[in-house]
Amino acid sequence: MNLAVQDVVKRPLITEKAERAREASRQYAFEVHRDATKIQVKQAVEKLFNVHVLDVRTAIARGKNKRVGRNVGRRPNWKKAYVTLKEGDTIALFEGT
């Protein structure tokens, strides 16, 4: 599937687990388009943030069941990607600068 670069990466994931991975091993977490491949994620992150990506690991997160009163619904499944950057590269969006 042909996705535009800005459509591949949806948003950064700012969680405690993602912060530990970023501090320990230069891994940054993103929510990405469900149909995006690892190669597309790598190209998108390199182009959007002007960094060199060494590795991309992806996982499909299951949507949670949600209730509103008696009605039961389900949030959709989504994909997250852990991106490892080259030594010395950082993404300012995560650094807070």
Curated annotation (Swiss-Prot):
InterPro entries: Nucleotide-bd_a/b_plait_sf (IPR012677), Ribosomal_uL23-like (IPR013025), Ribosomal_uL23/eL15/eS24_sf (IPR012678), Ribosomal_uL23_CS (IPR001014). Pfam families: Ribosomal_L23. One of its GO terms (cellular component) is ribosome. The keyword Ribosomal protein applies. GO terms for biological process: translation. Keywords: Ribonucleoprotein, Ribosomal protein, RNA-binding, rRNA-binding. One of its GO terms (molecular function) is rRNA binding. It comes from the Bacteria. The keyword DNA-binding does not apply. Part of the 50S ribosomal subunit. Contacts protein L29, and trigger factor when it is bound to the ribosome. HAMAP family: Ribosomal_uL23_B. One of the early assembly proteins it binds 23S rRNA. One of the proteins that surrounds the polypeptide exit tunnel on the outside of the ribosome. Forms the main docking site for trigger factor binding to the ribosome. Belongs to the universal ribosomal protein uL23 family. This is Large ribosomal subunit protein uL23.
